[in-house]
């Protein structure tokens, strides 16, 4: 009896690689695409905007996990639209033509906008484009995905992960540690902005359910972690690991000025930088995200507390030399 097959876009990324490992452990034949090939993991080279190099690998797949996206505040808006919106449409088209049963589209809690949503926001709350390229493209990509579902083209499930951390996470593990070591981590809003950490293993468990549960088609799910915390609490775990003082905090306006200046210097030196006003605003959120729908429909309940997740993350960081 043949194994069920799954295809992952962005298969070499943090989440894509973790998904591949977990689906393989659950008996799936795993295939994927990313900008660089990895034959050992059945990953072919390609760009989601151009399906020609990879569309044949969709044949026989039950599910496509569409994780590929530009996840950066430092990339031009046009490039983000190409990858995040047009790329999503191309994946939907290719999957439908190959007879794939379902596409799981990876969005983000940022589709609610970075500010102005209620604490414990539910999936019924409207999404909000706010002029920031990453947010706007996530909103547009969701609309593109649900349009395909509504038209009967292909079944779609949308997931909105919280702030994913753990071994291999660049935005919420590796980069913060590097910034702390350089003495450059400064938190806005006095460190009281709300952070919604979800440990990578908990997220993967939720994705397995979203990809296979019969009631998940046509639905969207927030996938935050056990509980929201302040930014000062979250990033304080990393300063502790490095034997540094707790994160420095300043008023938001000061943080914006500092980040803008530092980011300008980095770009002048020819380096990409996430230091900008957009990153600062994200760390001033006033609320978290409800996971009640994922619990009710999928039976998903995150299991890894922040303390436990950070203990696992610290062990990985030490092994990889990031804490030296």
What are these regions (language model features)?
Residues 90-133:
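Conserved Rossmann-fold NAD(P)-dependent oxidoreductase catalytic core, especially the SDR/UDP-sugar
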Residues 139, 152-154, 165-175, 201, ...:
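Glycine/proline-rich active-site loop of Rossmann-fold NAD(P)-dependent oxidoreductases
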């Amino acid at each position: 009896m043949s194994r069920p097959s799954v295809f992952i876009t962005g298969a070499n990324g943090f989440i894509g690689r973790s998904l591949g490992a977990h689906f393989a452990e659950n008996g799936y034949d795993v295939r994927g695409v990313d900008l660089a090939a990895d034959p050992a993991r059945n990953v072919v080279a390609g760009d989601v905007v151009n399906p020609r190099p990879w569309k044949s690998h969709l044949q026989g797949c039950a599910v496509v996990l569409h994780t590929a996206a530009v996840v950066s505040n430092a990339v031009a808006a046009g490039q983000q639209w190409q990858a995040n919106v047009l790329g999503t449409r191309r994946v939907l088209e290719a999957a439908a033509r190959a007879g794939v049963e379902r596409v799981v589209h990876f969005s983000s809690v940022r589709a609610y906008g970075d500010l102005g949503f209620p604490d414990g926001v539910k999936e019924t709350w409207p999404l909000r484009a706010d002029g920031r390229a990453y947010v706007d493209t996530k909103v547009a990509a969701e609309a593109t995905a649900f349009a395909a579902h509504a038209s009967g083209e292909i079944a779609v499930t949308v997931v909105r992960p919280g702030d994913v951390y753990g071994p291999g996470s660049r935005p919420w593990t590796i980069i913060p540690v590097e910034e702390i070591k350089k003495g450059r981590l400064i938190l806005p809003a006095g460190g009281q902005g709300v952070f919604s950490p979800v440990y990578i293993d908990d997220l993967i468990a939720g994705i397995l359910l979203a990809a296979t549960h019969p009631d998940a088609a046509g639905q969207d799910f927030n996938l935050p972690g056990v509980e929201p915390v302040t930014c000062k609490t979250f990033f304080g775990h990393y300063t502790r690991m490095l034997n540094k003082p707790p994160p420095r905090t300043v008023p938001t306006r000061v943080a914006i000025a500092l980040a803008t200046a530092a980011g300008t210097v980095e770009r002048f030196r020819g380096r990409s930088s996430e230091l900008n006003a957009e990153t600062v605003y994200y760390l001033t959120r006033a609320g978290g995200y409800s996971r009640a729908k994922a619990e009710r429909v999928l039976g998903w309940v995150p299991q890894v507390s922040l303390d436990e997740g950070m203990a696992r993350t610290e062990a990985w960081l030490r092994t990889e030399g990031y804490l030296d």
